[in-house]
C-alpha cells in the first residue's frame, strides 16, 4: 500500500495512492461489510453456526460483524449552544401507517427521539406534524451527508455501477468514503474516450491535519463543498470538470414500519395479492401491497411445505440478516398457508431475466458484475456463519440497473416434502448441489461455493440448465467419478478455471466467497491502478 508517483520532469504529475493489493492478492483486501450507510454502527448478532452441519438451529454462536442498516444510531447530541440539532429531508416520503410522518424533500426536522434505530420520532418545522420518519431519509443540516453528491460508504464497484447507469453524461460524479484510507474520501467521475468508451475514474481526496481537503497539495480547500465548487468550474487536471451529481436512488428500508421492526408477524388481512409473478414447487410469488400503500413481494407456501414453528424460528434469524445484496425479509404470516413478505424486485428471478428478459442481450462485463454482486451477498452470509443451501439463478432476484439480490436463504432446510428431503428425489436441485451435500447431507458454506460455480455457468449460458443432456442420477454418478462441466462457449478460460476451483472435491480447497467477490469485482480492472493520476494536478 505505497504512494506511487508518476515522475514526469516536463509537467509535474502527482498520483493518488494506489492500492497495490489489486495485483497482489485479489479478494483479500475486503474487510468490513461494505453495505452503504451514512453513520454505521456494529451490532452483535446471535446466529446459529450452520457451517457445522452437525449443529442444530438452537446452537448459537456470537458473531461479530453484523452491520446495522440504520443511517444514524444512538441518542443525538446537540450542536453549539442551541440544544437542538436540525435535520433535512433528502427524499420525499409517504407515510405508511398512522404513526409515520409524510414529508417532502428539503423539509427540516427537530428529532424528538432517536432510540428506535432505523426510525426516529420527529417534528417537521415546515408542517408542525409529529411522527416517525426513516432515519436514512434525513441528514444533519449543512453536513456533507446532506449534499446531493455525497454517497457515504459506497464501494468502488457500486460507484461505477451507479455512474455508468443509462442517461448519466460525462462529468457525472459522486464523493464517497475511501475503502482503503480511513478519514479520506474518493471522487468518482464518469468519463469517456475513444479507447475505453464510457468508464469511471477515481481520485483520492486527502484530509489535512488542520481539517482541510485536497486532491493535489497545490489546491487545498477548507471544505469538501469548496473542493466540489472548484472542480465544477474547471477540470484543473482531472479527466473533466464536475458536471452533475450522480442520481441517488431511494434508500431501502429494512422494516415496513416502526411497529413491524420488532413485531413482524402481521395480519393476513393487511396484505393484498395483486399480480402473480411465479409458480414453484412449493408455492407462488405475488406482487402485492401491505396496508394498501406499500409495494411488497409475497411468497405463499403450500400447506404442509414446512412446519410453521420451524419456519418462525428460522425467520427470527433471517430477519437479522441485513445487507444490500440480500432480499430483505419484512414480515411473515406464520399460520398456514405461510406468507413471507419481502422487498419487491422489479425484474423477477435472474433465471427468467436471462432466458426471456432483458438479460438475453447482456455482454460478459455485465454478467461478471452480476456474479460479483451475488458473491458479495454470499460473502456477508459467510461472515455471519450462515448457509444458503439452495443457491441458483432461480433464487436470485433482479431490480432496476441490473441490481442482483439473494433470496430464499435458509428456507431449503425447512422443507418437509419427501420428494425434496430424500435429496435425490424429483424436487431436489441435484445439479446445483455439492456431492457431499447431496450424498451425506453435509451442507456448509463450502457447498454453497460449489452451487455458486454452477450459477456462474447459468450466467454465461443465459440460463441454460446445467449438465445438458444428463438426468439427476447421471449427474450424481459422473460428478462422483470426477466429471466437471467443460468451458461453456464464449466463456473466458480464467472464468472456467474459477468454476473448477468452486467444484474441488475437497470442500476446504474451494475458495471463500470473500475471494470470489474480489476476483470478480476486479476481473476487468486487475491490471489498472485503482486511483487515477491527474494531468498536471
Curated annotation (Swiss-Prot):
<keyword id="KW-0727">SH2 domain</keyword>
<dbReference type="InterPro" id="IPR020635">
    <property type="entry name" value="Tyr_kinase_cat_dom"/>
</dbReference>
<feature type="lipid moiety-binding region" description="S-palmitoyl cysteine">
    <location>
        <position position="3"/>
    </location>
</feature>
<dbReference type="InterPro" id="IPR001245">
    <property type="entry name" value="Ser-Thr/Tyr_kinase_cat_dom"/>
</dbReference>
<dbReference type="GO" id="GO:0005102">
    <property type="term" value="F:signaling receptor binding"/>
</dbReference>
<keyword id="KW-0564">Palmitate</keyword>
<dbReference type="InterPro" id="IPR017441">
    <property type="entry name" value="Protein_kinase_ATP_BS"/>
</dbReference>
<keyword id="KW-0449">Lipoprotein</keyword>
<dbReference type="InterPro" id="IPR047924">
    <property type="entry name" value="Fyn/Yrk_SH2"/>
</dbReference>
<dbReference type="InterPro" id="IPR001452">
    <property type="entry name" value="SH3_domain"/>
</dbReference>
<keyword id="KW-0829">Tyrosine-protein kinase</keyword>
<comment type="similarity">
    <text>Belongs to the protein kinase superfamily. Tyr protein kinase family. SRC subfamily.</text>
</comment>
<dbReference type="InterPro" id="IPR008266">
    <property type="entry name" value="Tyr_kinase_AS"/>
</dbReference>
<dbReference type="InterPro" id="IPR000719">
    <property type="entry name" value="Prot_kinase_dom"/>
</dbReference>
<feature type="binding site">
    <location>
        <position position="299"/>
    </location>
    <ligand>
        <name>ATP</name>
    </ligand>
</feature>
<dbReference type="InterPro" id="IPR036028">
    <property type="entry name" value="SH3-like_dom_sf"/>
</dbReference>
<feature type="lipid moiety-binding region" description="S-palmitoyl cysteine">
    <location>
        <position position="6"/>
    </location>
</feature>
<keyword id="KW-0519">Myristate</keyword>
<dbReference type="Pfam" id="PF00017">
    <property type="entry name" value="SH2"/>
</dbReference>
<keyword id="KW-0547">Nucleotide-binding</keyword>
<dbReference type="InterPro" id="IPR000980">
    <property type="entry name" value="SH2"/>
</dbReference>
<keyword id="KW-0067">ATP-binding</keyword>
<keyword id="KW-0808">Transferase</keyword>
<dbReference type="InterPro" id="IPR036860">
    <property type="entry name" value="SH2_dom_sf"/>
</dbReference>
<keyword id="KW-0217">Developmental protein</keyword>
<feature type="domain" description="SH2">
    <location>
        <begin position="149"/>
        <end position="246"/>
    </location>
</feature>
<comment type="subunit">
    <text>Associates through its SH3 domain, to the p85 subunit of phosphatidylinositol 3-kinase.</text>
</comment>
<feature type="active site" description="Proton acceptor">
    <location>
        <position position="390"/>
    </location>
</feature>
<feature type="modified residue" description="Phosphotyrosine; by autocatalysis">
    <location>
        <position position="420"/>
    </location>
</feature>
<feature type="binding site">
    <location>
        <begin position="277"/>
        <end position="285"/>
    </location>
    <ligand>
        <name>ATP</name>
    </ligand>
</feature>
<dbReference type="InterPro" id="IPR050198">
    <property type="entry name" value="Non-receptor_tyrosine_kinases"/>
</dbReference>
<dbReference type="Pfam" id="PF07714">
    <property type="entry name" value="PK_Tyr_Ser-Thr"/>
</dbReference>
<dbReference type="Pfam" id="PF00018">
    <property type="entry name" value="SH3_1"/>
</dbReference>
<dbReference type="GO" id="GO:0050852">
    <property type="term" value="P:T cell receptor signaling pathway"/>
</dbReference>
<keyword id="KW-0597">Phosphoprotein</keyword>
<feature type="lipid moiety-binding region" description="N-myristoyl glycine">
    <location>
        <position position="2"/>
    </location>
</feature>
<keyword id="KW-0418">Kinase</keyword>
<comment type="function">
    <text>Tyrosine-protein kinase implicated in the control of cell growth. Plays a role in the regulation of intracellular calcium levels. Required in brain development and mature brain function with important roles in the regulation of axon growth, axon guidance, and neurite extension. Blocks axon outgrowth and attraction induced by ntn1 by phosphorylating its receptor ddc.</text>
</comment>
<dbReference type="GO" id="GO:0046872">
    <property type="term" value="F:metal ion binding"/>
</dbReference>
<feature type="modified residue" description="Phosphotyrosine">
    <location>
        <position position="531"/>
    </location>
</feature>
<dbReference type="GO" id="GO:0005524">
    <property type="term" value="F:ATP binding"/>
</dbReference>
<feature type="domain" description="SH3">
    <location>
        <begin position="82"/>
        <end position="143"/>
    </location>
</feature>
Amino acid at each position: 500500500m505505497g504512494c506511487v508517483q508518476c515522475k514526469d520532469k516536463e509537467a509535474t504529475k502527482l498520483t493518488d495512492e494506489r492500492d497495490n493489493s489489486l495485483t497482489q492478492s485479489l479478494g483479500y483486501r475486503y474487510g468490513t461489510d461494505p453495505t452503504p450507510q451514512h453513520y454505521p454502527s456494529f451490532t452483535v448478532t446471535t446466529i446459529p453456526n450452520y457451517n457445522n452441519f452437525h449443529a442444530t438451529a438452537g446452537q448459537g454462536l456470537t458473531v461479530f460483524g453484523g452491520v446495522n442498516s440504520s443511517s444514524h444510531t444512538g441518542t443525538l447530541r446537540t450542536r453549539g449552544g442551541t440544544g437542538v440539532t436540525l435535520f433535512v429531508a433528502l427524499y420525499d416520503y409517504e407515510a405508511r401507517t398512522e404513526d409515520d410522518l409524510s414529508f417532502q424533500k428539503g423539509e427540516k426536522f427537530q428529532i424528538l427521539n432517536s432510540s428506535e434505530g432505523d426510525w426516529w420520532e420527529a417534528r417537521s418545522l415546515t408542517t408542525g406534524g409529529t411522527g416517525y420518519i426513516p432515519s436514512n431519509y434525513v441528514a444533519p443540516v449543512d453536513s456533507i451527508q446532506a449534499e446531493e453528491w455525497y454517497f457515504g460508504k459506497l464501494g468502488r464497484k457500486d460507484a461505477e455501477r451507479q455512474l455508468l447507469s443509462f442517461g448519466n453524461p460525462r462529468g457525472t460524479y459522486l464523493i464517497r468514503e475511501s475503502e482503503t484510507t480511513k478519514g479520506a474520501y474518493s471522487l468518482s467521475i464518469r468519463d469517456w474516450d475513444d479507447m475505453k468508451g464510457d468508464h469511471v475514474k477515481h481520485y483520492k481526496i486527502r484530509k489535512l491535519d488542520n481539517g482541510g481537503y485536497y486532491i493535489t497539495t497545490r489546491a487545498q480547500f477548507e471544505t469538501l463543498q469548496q473542493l466540489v465548487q472548484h472542480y465544477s468550474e474547471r477540470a484543473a487536471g482531472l479527466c473533466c470538470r464536475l458536471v452533475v451529481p450522480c442520481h441517488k436512488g431511494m434508500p431501502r428500508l429494512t422494516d415496513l414500519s416502526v411497529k413491524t421492526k420488532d413485531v413482524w408477524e402481521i395480519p393476513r388481512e393487511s396484505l393484498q395479492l395483486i399480480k402473480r409473478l411465479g409458480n414453484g414447487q412449493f408455492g407462488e410469488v405475488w406482487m402485492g401491497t401491505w396496508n394498501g400503500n406499500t409495494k411488497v413481494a409475497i411468497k405463499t407456501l403450500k400447506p404442509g411445505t414446512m412446519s410453521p414453528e420451524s419456519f418462525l424460528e428460522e425467520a427470527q434469524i433471517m430477519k437479522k440478516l441485513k445487507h444490500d445484496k440480500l432480499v430483505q425479509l419484512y414480515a411473515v404470516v406464520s399460520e398456514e398457508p405461510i406468507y413471507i413478505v419481502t422487498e419487491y424486485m422489479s425484474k423477477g428471478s435472474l433465471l427468467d431475466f436471462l432466458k426471456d428478459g432483458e438479460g438475453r442481450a447482456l455482454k460478459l462485463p455485465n454478467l461478471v458484475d452480476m456474479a460479483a454482486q451475488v458473491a458479495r451477498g454470499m460473502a456477508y452470509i459467510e461472515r455471519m456463519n450462515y448457509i444458503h443451501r439452495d443457491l441458483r439463478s432461480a433464487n436470485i432476484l433482479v431490480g432496476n440497473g441490473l441490481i442482483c439480490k439473494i433470496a430464499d436463504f435458509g428456507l431449503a432446510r425447512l422443507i418437509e416434502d419427501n420428494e425434496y428431503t430424500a435429496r435425490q428425489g424429483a424436487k431436489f436441485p441435484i445439479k446445483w448441489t455439492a456431492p457431499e451435500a447431496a450424498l451425506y447431507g453435509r451442507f456448509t458454506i463450502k457447498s454453497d461455493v460449489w452451487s455458486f460455480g454452477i450459477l456462474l455457468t447459468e450466467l454465461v449460458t443465459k440460463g441454460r440448465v446445467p449438465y445438458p443432456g444428463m438426468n439427476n442420477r447421471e449427474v450424481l454418478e459422473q460428478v462422483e467419478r470426477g466429471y466437471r462441466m467443460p468451458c461453456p462457449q464464449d466463456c473466458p478460460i480464467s472464468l472456467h478455471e474459477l468454476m473448477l476451483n468452486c467444484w474441488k472435491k475437497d470442500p476446504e480447497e474451494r475458495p471463500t466467497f470473500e475471494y470470489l467477490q474480489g476476483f470478480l469485482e476486479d476481473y476487468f480492472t486487475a491490471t489498472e491502478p485503482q486511483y487515477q493520476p491527474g494531468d498536471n494536478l
